[in-house]
Amino acid sequence: MNKIMSSYDAISLIKNGDTVAVGGFIGCGHPEELTIKINESFLEKGFPNNLTLVYAAGQGDSKDKGLNRLGVEGLVSKVIGGHWGLAPKLVKLAIENKIQAYNLPQGVISHLYRDIAAGKPGTITHVGLKTFVDPRIDGGKLNDITKEDIVKVIEIDNKEYLFYKAFPINVTLLRASYADEFGNATMEKEAVTLDGLSMAQAAKNSGGIVILQVEKIVANGTLDPRKVKIPGILVDAIVISKPENHMQTYAEQYNPSYNGEIKMALTNIPGLKLDERKIISRRAAMELIPNAITNLGIGVPEGISMVANEEGIGSGLKVTLESGPIGGIPAGGLSFGASINPESILDQ
């Protein structure tokens, strides 16, 4: 079977009404070529339509890229997502009651991929208790037309937990750096690896398919097997992307310090401009504890490690991001999710 095909042929494998899981983290690791072609196909032919979209991190640029390509009335009918803030076109559909919409914790969705892959009935965790995700409050539902309960409260050994129900995934859309002709894929030029393997396994265990976007295709047997992150036995279609649709982040085509190809000199890292965000970051940096493991989130926290580096205390920090990098200096803006000079990069 020839797995290498055009983007249009690949997305023609998606059926109306399918549940589609899409990888990525802001602009890192998002299969932009595929979401562009889904958008174009729907606008030209009305196909595919009525999709259920599932994603963990928020893939988007707050404008038109990423999941915003799918924010068209009729293309999607339901969204189960972690971070919505960078996909305003999906947000608009949810606010206007044009789609069913759920907001679940990002990490829970990552674990759901693993549990769907394992054939489990769902994910059990304390995360979300007594928040808007708790079914006794909103159950993660974002509008009036969203009725189905996909989260419930259970009790184990007299302790309450939330049970997030598993569901079949018909199609998974992923991105890698290189793939061989069979579909074995490596991610050496990606800033993060994210949930790729779990998402692929979740689709295959649901009887679904995996469509992979790559920068280049190489001959079978030429990839280092230790670097293969997604085995070809899980891949159904491979699409070669245009370079502009395979940027390492939405801000940069390629930065070798994000994926460990080089170590950037700290003196070459530009500082933040002096504004209210930098002032807040500087004040927050004063609370940092040397050698403590510190997790930074999106938004204002992005600047904390930059300020720490400017002040000469960055080397004493162990900064982590939920996207996977440990150590280094987290990038900001549309490169958030990547880190400059990371010590290691784990799955999300």
List each model region and its residues.
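Conserved alpha/beta enzyme-core scaffold
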Residues: M1-Q348
